[in-house]
Each structure stands twice: as C-alpha cells, then as structure tokens.
Regions:
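Conserved acidic residues
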Residues: 32, 82, 103
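N-terminal glycine-rich "phosphate-gripper" loop used for MgATP/nucleotide binding
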Residues: 36-37, 60-61, 65-69, 79-95
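Short, structured coil segments at secondary-structure junctions
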Residues: 50-51, 101
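Internal anion-binding site segments
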Residues: 5, 120, 194-216
C-alpha cells in the first residue's frame, strides 16, 4: 500500500478527489498526513472528516525557507511517506524537500505545460485566446511548474469562456488524471529519463484527452 503525504493551502478539491479514489478502491493507498501553510484552509475540514492527521506549519514561524522545508521533509519521513501530493499548495517547494523526495513529489497545474505556468493558468489561457486548454500532472523540481510531465488532459476553450467557466471544465479533468498518476506510481509503472516520464501502460492512459469540437 502506498503511503501519501498531502500539502495544501486552500480548499483541497484534489485532496478530496484522492480521498474519494482511495475509498472507492481505485487507489491502493492511505493518506498519512495533511500539511498546510494556512490555518483557515478548507482542506483541514476535509482531513478532519476523514480522520486524517493535520499539521499546520506556518512559514513565518521558521527562521528561513530551507528550515521550513527540512521540517516538512522530517515530518513526512517520520510517517514513512512514499509520495508527496501537492493539492493546491501555493508555494514554490524548497530544495531540502525536493532532494529528499526526488521524483516523489507530484503537482497538478491547470494548464497544458509548458504553456501558462505559475498563478492563474486558466486566466492566462483565456486572455491568450487559446482553442485548447487543460491540466498537467508533473513531478516537482526547483522551478515553477517546470518538472517532468507525467500526464496531461485537454479540454476545449471557447470564445465566450471566462476564467471561471474554463476553470470548472479543467477541474473535472484534474480530478480524473491526478488519481491516475498516483495509481501509475503506486504500480511502479513510471520511470523518469531526463525530461521524459516513461509510462508502462496502454497508450490511452497517458495521452492527452482530445477535446470535442468547438461550438460552431
């Protein structure tokens, strides 16, 4: 069984998606701990409702960034965490955590990387006028949404889309492909080779999902 540690800053809808997929039996995993940098995060309520241990770790209570991430890494190691899930963790992860969990930290980003990294990927896509948008599960490195790509899924982007309408469409795919990425990892079917993530699977499990035709 895979042991997960989750980092979240806000509502934690992807955290809930992982919980639901564990309960359904799709994922052979358990969540050992939720770590949040926000004492008001709704993710805390989700953890409480599912009897998941929660640690509220506020960066300003640590002398500097590295000590904060060393402490997080220590807490995860204490609980024998195999894979770290970033479920809306709104900080750039520090080197001490990345080094101790190399290729064992996954993030989901609401855009088709390498396009539109950073904050508000959906808004960037709407303003740019793209015809296809989507989401990306990737391993975390020291950059901002620059780590090796694991899975992507695409959705149509319409001319009358707002940030909210596009976000809603993308979020449904986030809740589908993040659990899939965790499942592939748990089954030992993911290998990293340079910038490429190789997946031992049927092709349809790893490709971009083709969006339907636009509204014409």
């Amino acid at each position: 069984m895979l042991t997960l540690g989750v980092l979240a800053s806000g509502r934690g809808s992807n955290f809930q998606s992982i919980i639901d997929n564990i309960k359904s039996g799709y994922l052979n995993a358990k969540i050992a701990v939720l770590i949040t940098d926000n004492s008001d995060a709704y993710a805390i309520e989700r953890a409480r409702n599912n009897n998941i241990e929660t640690l509220v770790l506020i960066p300003k209570n640590f002398p500097e960034k590295d000590s904060y991430y060393r402490h997080i890494a220590d807490e995860l190691k204490k609980r024998s965490v195999d894979l770290v899930i970033l479920a809306g963790f709104m900080r750039v992860v520090g080197r001490p955590l990345i080094e101790r969990f190399k290729y064992r930290i996954m993030n989901i980003h609401p855009a088709l990387l390498p396009s539109f990294p950073g904050l508000h990927g959906q808004k960037q896509a709407v303003e740019y006028g793209v015809k296809i948008a989507g989401c990306t599960v990737h391993f975390v490195d020291e950059g901002v949404d620059t780590g090796p790509i694991i899975i992507q899924s695409a959705v149509p982007a319409y001319e009358d889309d707002t940030e909210d309408s596009l976000s809603e469409r993308i979020l449904k795919e986030e809740h589908r492909i993040f659990p899939l990425a965790v499942k592939l990892f748990s089954e030992g079917r993911i290998k990293v080779k340079g910038r490429k993530v190789l997946i031992e699977s049927k092709r349809e499990e790893a490709v971009i999902t083709n969006p339907p035709h636009s509204k014409i």
